[in-house]
Structures are given as C-alpha cells and as structure tokens.
Amino acid sequence: MNISIISIGKLKEKYLKQGIAEYLKRLSAYAKVEVIELPDEKAPENLSEAEMLIVKEKEGIRILDKISDDTHVIALAIEGKQKSSEEFAISLDRLATYGKSKVAFVIGGSLGLSSEVMKRSNESLSFSKMTLPHQLMRLVLLEQVYRAFRINRGEPYHK
C-alpha cells in the first residue's frame, strides 16, 4: 500500500518532526508512506467569509494537484466520521483487500479544507469533535496508521 499524507503548512516544532520521523521509520516495514507538505496561503488575521473561501480554494488547488485519479482520498475534518482504532484498522484492511493501493490522507490548513477537496474525498474522518492543531494531526494520524497495521497483523502494540 502507498500512503500519502498531504498537509497544508510547514512543520516547525522539533518534537513533532521527531515523532513523525519515528512513525515513518516504523511504518516502512508495512507500507510506503510519504508526507507531502504544501505551503499555506498567507492571509491576514481577520478574514471575511469571502477571503476565507479564497484561501481554502487556493490551498485546495495545491492539494488536488498532488492526488492522482486512482487514489482513495480520506479527508481529515472535524465533521468527519469518528472511528475506534479497531474500526480504522478494518477500514485500511478493506481498502487493501479491494485493490486500493494508493491512499491519501488530507489535512487542511487552519481554515480547513475547500469544498472541492471535500468533493474529491472518498470519505471524511474525524479524530475528535475537538479542534486540534493541523500540525499535531500528522503525528496522531501516523500513530493510528501504524497501530492499524499492527492490529491487522495481530502484532502486539494495541491494548
């Protein structure tokens, strides 16, 4: 399975970079995983609704440009479906079973994802009803993907 994590914004925090590097290393035994970091759109602090839409649309174009037609796209969004770790593992296993060898997880910028990205997505996933920093989501997502592979192989890790 080829997994892409497409994310808006540059990761700055050293501790997050270290955690992400660790999970990428662990995941290399199970799948080819790449993190694609795309620049966020520079915008002033107080945006109108119209300006917010423009920012999301510009970021959305960058995201969609990185997704091929044969990729199964999972948008990370607060309004997405929440799953347990076991349910998430089953979902990933089903994708592999049904021949979906390319999977892209999409993490938007601080304003979220554009409507075009949401339309392109095959499903939407939420890790919590809480708002979480999009940079932290990369680490949380990688840990859950790793956990899913361990669950699916019956390997110790998940409790």
Swiss-Prot record:
InterPro entries: Alpha/beta_knot_MTases, RlmH-like, tRNA_m1G_MTases_N. Keywords: Cytoplasm, Methyltransferase, rRNA processing, S-adenosyl-L-methionine, Transferase. It is found in: Cytoplasm. Its main location: cytoplasm. GO terms for molecular function: rRNA (pseudouridine-N3-)-methyltransferase activity. It catalyses: pseudouridine(1915) in 23S rRNA + S-adenosyl-L-methionine = N(3)-methylpseudouridine(1915) in 23S rRNA + S-adenosyl-L-homocysteine + H(+). S-adenosyl-L-methionine binds at residues 76, 108, 127-132. The keyword Phosphoprotein does not apply. PANTHER family: METHYLTRANSFERASE, RIBOSOMAL RNA LARGE SUBUNIT METHYLTRANSFERASE H. Belongs to the RNA methyltransferase RlmH family. This is Ribosomal RNA large subunit methyltransferase H. The gene is rlmH.
